[in-house]
């Protein structure tokens, strides 16, 4: 179920402060965050945000096509190593 329009998009306060600070100063630096549930807003376009995937921070460059999506969508948490060649059950 989608979030109510009355509430507006969710974004962590600390992340919003950091983005606003970078926008006013004009600096370009990587913002580290653990907030995968934060929605990407138009003010974030052009910034690089390092999103935590449970093990490390993956840098994500924000483009205008990403607006409205969540940060966690662009930092995968699981890596598939592949099935072993002799595993008969996985090959069925």
Swiss-Prot record:
Pfam families with a match to the protein in the record: Ribosomal_S19
SUPFAM superfamilies named among the record's database cross-references: Ribosomal protein S19 (SSF54570)
Ribosomal protein listed as a keyword: yes
Entry superkingdom: Eukaryota
Keyword line: Cyanelle, Plastid, Ribonucleoprotein, Ribosomal protein, RNA-binding, rRNA-binding
One of the record's GO molecular function terms: rRNA binding
TM region positions: none
GO cellular component: cyanelle; mitochondrial small ribosomal subunit
PROSITE patterns: RIBOSOMAL_S19
BP GO terms, sorted: ribosomal small subunit assembly; translation
Location of the protein in the cell: Plastid, Cyanelle
Biological role stated in the UniProt entry: Protein S19 forms a complex with S13 that binds strongly to the 16S ribosomal RNA.
PANTHER family the UniProt entry points to: RIBOSOMAL PROTEIN S19P FAMILY MEMBER (PTHR11880), SMALL RIBOSOMAL SUBUNIT PROTEIN US19M (PTHR11880:SF8)
UniProt family annotation: Belongs to the universal ribosomal protein uS19 family.
Name of the protein in its database record: Small ribosomal subunit protein uS19c
């Amino acid at each position: 179920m989608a979030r109510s329009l009355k509430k507006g998009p969710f974004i962590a306060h600390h992340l919003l402060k950091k983005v606003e600070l970078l926008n006013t100063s004009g600096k370009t630096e990587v913002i580290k965050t653990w907030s995968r549930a934060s929605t990407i807003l138009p003010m974030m376009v052009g910034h690089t945000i390092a999103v935590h995937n449970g093990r490390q921070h993956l840098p994500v460059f924000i483009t205008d096509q990403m607006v409205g999506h969540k940060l966690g969508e662009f930092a995968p948490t699981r890596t598939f190593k592949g099935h072993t060649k002799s595993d008969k059950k996985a090959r069925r």
